[in-house]
Amino acid sequence: MAGGRVAHATLKGPSVVKEIFIGLTLGLVAGGMWKMHHWNEQRKTRSFYDMLEKGQISVVVEE
């Protein structure tokens, strides 16, 4: 039984440019999501203080 040669995929080392691109993309996506989260929190805080200033809400418990 003569064994034939099977073509296997040769493993290459990591591509530096590809790794930089993937890292940059993931960093920008994560940074954008973090920034959007903080904008949302800032909007909620500003809305709370605006309502407090207008007298629509109060932080004092009514008895």
Curated annotation (Swiss-Prot):
User: Transmembrane region positions?
Assistant: 16-34
Record protein name field: Cytochrome c oxidase subunit 5C
GO CC, any one term? mitochondrial inner membrane
- Subcellular location(s) of the protein: Mitochondrion inner membrane
Task: State the superkingdom.
Answer: Eukaryota
Per the similarity annotation, which family is this? Belongs to the cytochrome c oxidase subunit 5C family.
PANTHER family attached to this UniProt entry: CYTOCHROME C OXIDASE SUBUNIT 5C-2-RELATED
Q: What are the entry keywords?
A: Membrane, Mitochondrion, Mitochondrion inner membrane, Transmembrane, Transmembrane helix
Tell me the function of this protein: This protein is one of the nuclear-coded polypeptide chains of cytochrome c oxidase, the terminal oxidase in mitochondrial electron transport.
